[in-house]
Amino acid sequence: MEILTFIIYLITFFILFDFYKKNKRYSKSPNKEANGPWSLPIIGGLHLIGDRPNRSFSELSKIYGGIYKIWLAERMLMIVTDPEIIQDIWIKQHDKFVNRPHNITSQIFSLNHKSLVFGDVDEWNKVRPKMTCHFTKIKLNSTKPKQIVNDQLKKMLKIMTTHSLDSKPFNQYVYLNTYSMNIILGLMLSIELPHSNSNDKDGQFSKVLHSIDEIFKSIGTNGPEDIFPTLLPFFKNRISTFTNHLNVIKDFIRSIYKQQIKTFDINIEPRNIMDCLISEYYEDDDQEDEVAKQELIIQLCIDMLVAATDTSASTLEWFMLFMINNPNLQEDLYEEVVNVVGKDCPYVTFDDVPKLALIKACYFEILRIRPVTSLSLPRVSMEDTTTLNDIFIPKDTIIIQNIFGMGNSEKFVSNPTVFNPSRWLEYKKMKDLNQFGNRDDSIDTTNTTTNTTLNGTTSKYYNDLERVSIPFGVGKRRCMAPSMADHNVLIAMANIVLNFTMKSSDPKQMPLSEEEQYAITIKPKYPFKVLFEKRS
């Protein structure tokens, strides 16, 4: 009986202490403490977060402001839904927030935090220069990358034509991912995977694609193994499943590496990015052994393959959905393309794309209303610090950039839930007239224009779309290759509308739901298939 009483007292003490820890003030000055909801013992604010954290965090920002704190089980988070605070944390104070938070999923994925995506600052500083040089605008505008994109796009257009002639629904999940994956595989490894299951030897492509999808779900949704690390032994099956999916991708890349290292010649021009990495790592004078270098090269390739495949494919899937729901806009895009390239032209080139203002506006609007990485990847504060208005941020706080929340907030965008590409055309006109002031990537509180007052709240960033729509993040650890995404998606959009009319394969679904399914990249919540009609 005494033992039972002791256990009850112990549990009660733990619950009370945990409640106190999660709700106490961390700043010595009460008015400098970040707002936030009350957190419960053990779970913190998990009960406030549904299956779409991007939506939940955005709703909470309406109550608690542009930066607020919330506990998810054992970790304190601060959610930032304010462009000025984002500029301060992610750019001005970059060095204090450069690291990613550690959890079991990121640790397994990243060779114990040595990768480009999840690497700690020292490792990240080593590997980033080796990768970014391959994805500059100059490199992407060179002949080989353009040739790879054109080749893959023409193959996809051919498949679309076949589907249109047969009136067969198009499985955009498979074919868009094939298109995106083959571009990055061509750049990295000089290979491509088959566009049809009949040519998929041993189902290898399907396995890799499925594993990439599962990896994204695991990383993006913060499973219980990450939220409750003290209960890790109870989640061995989940960790094992994640590891198995990662190994499918690793084995695929490793098999290519072993083939390529046999024919690698440092005296000839690199054939692809893997050749460049092999050359750079084996010329380094560091003490890493050959196996460690091999694994790091494979890891960097995985980083790019996983990130580049899903983001471009998801953006194109959203494009198809919004075109089906907006047939008049679809025709406007067609007219624009025809006016630039001519009605008899079968293919839009890279040189044509800069002339397609409405196509680009449509692309930017998709990334605003459904940014594929809606919460970006989190950072962690490396020391006690403050942000604007002296709001205190304790050391080891996870910081989340609410990209979705800013682009979909009435505080920053007029009619934010409406898909309206023309807002970007108007924005460009306003920007050309310098209506938003002279701003660079640092915080600028001068020469800014207060655009409107909404619900009593004045925002100098209202409808300043490039400031409030940041689909690739900001700062040094933003998406490494936004130019590549622009290249791959814009030319695909233009050629699809030039050659086809898009409709839903099931008229009963119309209009298609524009709700999203949350993961590290967001996708349409409800499956749909596209019916292509070939334009005459």
From Swiss-Prot:
Organism source for this protein?
Dictyostelium discoideum (Social amoeba)
UniProt keywords, alphabetically: Heme, Iron, Membrane, Metal-binding, Monooxygenase, Oxidoreductase, Transmembrane, Transmembrane helix
What cofactor is this protein dependent on?
Answer: heme
Look up keyword Metal-binding and say if it applies. yes
What is the membrane topology noted in the UniProt record heading this document? Single-pass membrane protein
Per UniProt, subcellular location reads as:
Membrane
Concerning PANTHER family, the annotation shows: STEROID 17-ALPHA-HYDROXYLASE/17,20 LYASE (PTHR24289), STEROID 17-ALPHA-HYDROXYLASE_17,20 LYASE (PTHR24289:SF1)
Q: What class of enzyme is it?
A: oxidoreductase
Q: What is this protein called?
A: Probable cytochrome P450 520A1
| Pfam annotation, one family | p450
Coiled-coil intervals, chain numbering: none
Q: Where, by residue number, does heme bind?
A: C479
One MF term in the entry's GO annotations: iron ion binding
| GO CC annotations on file | membrane
Membrane-spanning regions, if any? 1-21
Q: Which CDD domains match?
A: CYP1_2-like
